[in-house]
Amino acid sequence: MSSPLHYVLDGIHCEPHFFTVPLDHQQPDDEETITLFGRTLCRKDRLDDELPWLLYLQGGPGFGAPRPSANGGWIKRALQEFRVLLLDQRGTGHSTPIHAELLAHLNPRQQADYLSHFRADSIVRDAELIREQLSPDHPWSLLGQSFGGFCSLTYLSLFPDSLHEVYLTGGVAPIGRSADEVYRATYQRVADKNRAFFARFPHAQAIANRLATHLQRHDVRLPNGQRLTVEQLQQQGLDLGASGAFEELYYLLEDAFIGEKLNPAFLYQVQAMQPFNTNPVFAILHELIYCEGAASHWAAERVRGEFPALAWAQGKDFAFTGEMIFPWMFEQFRELIPLKEAAHLLAEKADWGPLYDPVQLARNKVPVACAVYAEDMYVEFDYSRETLKGLSNSRAWITNEYEHNGLRVDGEQILDRLIRLNRDC
């Protein structure tokens, strides 16, 4: 661990750190390592206090930890009693980030083998090595948002004695459910969001239909040179499960045309809203977070056939898709094209190890408090409740007050409520 120069932000002492960990934790003596990045936060007036640690695990997979710009939200509440570690999970942010150029020297099989080491089990083993450096004599606590909550359940399965408290927000994993089952449930949620969106903004349907027809008939290029297709337009529904997303999407559509031509500003906005070129791990590993001893076989693509309303054709009303990954993306997105063969190999890989230990979770003694969002588009509510039935010492706050991004919207209040829930106060 190195300790570069710290800085102070809004009364917070911030210090970046780098950690070296094995690429493959099953082969720790292998010489191949990766570098992880984390940022520790502590209130400046409490630097000399003996504070417990809280590790924040970001959602995704494929996104780095937040870059704080103020003492607010959940960070403000956490810093009242914790030192916080914002960890860029392996392959994201500043932690040996995955991109096509990094893997260009490898053949597709080698690329797939390399990428297979970036799931939750490896992320958790990274975190445990870091805990042994930062808090060797004491367990630490976790705050897991979305996929970060999935990682937290993996942590509870592998290293329960290393944890003091766990807080999950929109992140109770569908343990025991296949990728097919997950997408079957989330497609229904996406269909519900489509109905709600077009009911709220009826005029948007005609604009979306016109856009789809225009993209089908014309070779439209984004500012980066990538062709914009109907399928990519459908993916603008990725954020429909977040508060404020309906308005953002409507305003995007509203400004799409200038007369008969597309507005250049619209094209820049669409490009900025696509995370797959900047965060390729999101596309490569998304289905694999649901795989234990089975291949995904492009589950979202196969299950989509059960929802014909989501398959656009001329003369049909347009509908958006959600958080689904499709094989065609590796033929259209510029940063995914070089990883196409590796992605197909990973989709056919069946010998994935376990991510969770249901027996250990059933006898769990670590207090776990969960915010479960009843209308979550990304993490199926019914499957979360199933998992909670098998997770001892857990308490759930079930609410429809927030969407999946509740922690970002009202993090101070949500974390405070979960802390009180865990401690019976």
UniProtKB/Swiss-Prot annotation:
The protein's matches in Pfam families, at most eight in alphabetical order, are given as: Abhydrolase_1
- Please give the Gene Ontology molecular function terms for this protein: aminopeptidase activity
Localization per Swiss-Prot or TrEMBL: Cytoplasm
**Which transformation does this protein catalyse, written as a reaction?**
Release of N-terminal proline from a peptide
* Enzyme Commission number(s): 3.4.11.5
Q: Which UniProt keywords apply?
A: Aminopeptidase, Cytoplasm, Hydrolase, Protease
Q: Where is the active site?
A: 146 (nucleophile), 351, 404 (proton donor)
List the InterPro entries.
AB_hydrolase_1 (IPR000073), AB_hydrolase_fold (IPR029058), Peptidase_S33 (IPR002410), Serine_prot/Carboxylest_S33 (IPR051601)
Q: What is this protein's function per UniProt? A: Higher activity toward long peptides. Acts on hydroxyproline beta-naphthylamide with almost as high an activity as on proline beta-naphthylamide.
Protein name per Swiss-Prot or TrEMBL: Proline iminopeptidase
Write the gene name. pip
